[in-house]
């Protein structure tokens, strides 16, 4: 079992119960899923780009991503409906906890010029979204094997009712928020 999952059960959950005065353990916010999304607009011109993005995403997430396609044709971007324009992965369960552990302990500290995560990235319902500019911050990506540096979106969906609960939950996992 992942180290962070044990930490959630043993320390984070009881701390949140006392902090927010929950009457039941089931009211305590928990992380439901983590979604990784990589937009690959260049895939319209070159099909190989999508293969590289899928390979990188598979290495990072530990499971095969789903190719996302354009819903509408947009002449300005030279895309047609049904064109592959990105890929995404939804992590739940054990893989989610393992990814979260790698994100907090290894990937975030490797971000260049890092000054803390923005607190403004909560959506009002306790979910947190962050962007990563380089996929090379993850240890699974070998620097000499990548064709291009790509970024990705990471969305952490929680069962928190508001941003305060969501932030307290993520701070319990040592997320480095700006002060």
From Swiss-Prot:
GO terms for cellular component: ribonucleoprotein complex; ribosome. Pfam families: Ribosomal_L5, Ribosomal_L5_C. It comes from the Bacteria. GO terms for biological process: translation. Keywords: Ribonucleoprotein, Ribosomal protein, RNA-binding, rRNA-binding, tRNA-binding. The keyword rRNA-binding applies. The keyword Metal-binding does not apply. One of its GO terms (molecular function) is rRNA binding. This is one of the proteins that bind and probably mediate the attachment of the 5S RNA into the large ribosomal subunit, where it forms part of the central protuberance. In the 70S ribosome it contacts protein S13 of the 30S subunit (bridge B1b), connecting the 2 subunits; this bridge is implicated in subunit movement. Contacts the P site tRNA; the 5S rRNA and some of its associated proteins might help stabilize positioning of ribosome-bound tRNAs. Part of the 50S ribosomal subunit; part of the 5S rRNA/L5/L18/L25 subcomplex. Contacts the 5S rRNA and the P site tRNA. Forms a bridge to the 30S subunit in the 70S ribosome. Belongs to the universal ribosomal protein uL5 family. This is Large ribosomal subunit protein uL5. It comes from Shewanella pealeana (strain ATCC 700345 / ANG-SQ1). The gene is rplE.
């Amino acid at each position: 079992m992942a180290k962070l999952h044990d930490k959630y059960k043993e320390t984070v959950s009881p701390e949140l119960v006392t902090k927010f005065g929950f009457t039941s353990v089931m009211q305590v916010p928990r992380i439901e899923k983590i979604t990784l999304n990589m937009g690959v607009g260049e895939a319209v011109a070159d099909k190989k780009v999508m293969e590289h993005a899928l390979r990188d995403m598979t290495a990072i997430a530990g499971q095969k991503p789903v190719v996302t396609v354009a819903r509408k044709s947009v002449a300005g971007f030279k895309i047609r409906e049904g064109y592959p324009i990105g890929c995404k992965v939804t992590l739940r369960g054990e893989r989610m906890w393992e990814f979260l552990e790698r994100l907090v302990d290894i990937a975030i500290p490797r971000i260049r010029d890092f000054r803390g995560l923005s607190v403004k990235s909560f959506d009002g319902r306790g979910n947190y979204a962050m962007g990563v500019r380089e996929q090379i911050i993850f240890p699974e990506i070998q620097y000499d094997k990548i064709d291009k540096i790509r970024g990705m979106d990471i969305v952490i969906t929680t069962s928190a009712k508001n941003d305060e609960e969501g932030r307290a939950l993520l701070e319990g996992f040592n997320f480095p928020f700006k002060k």
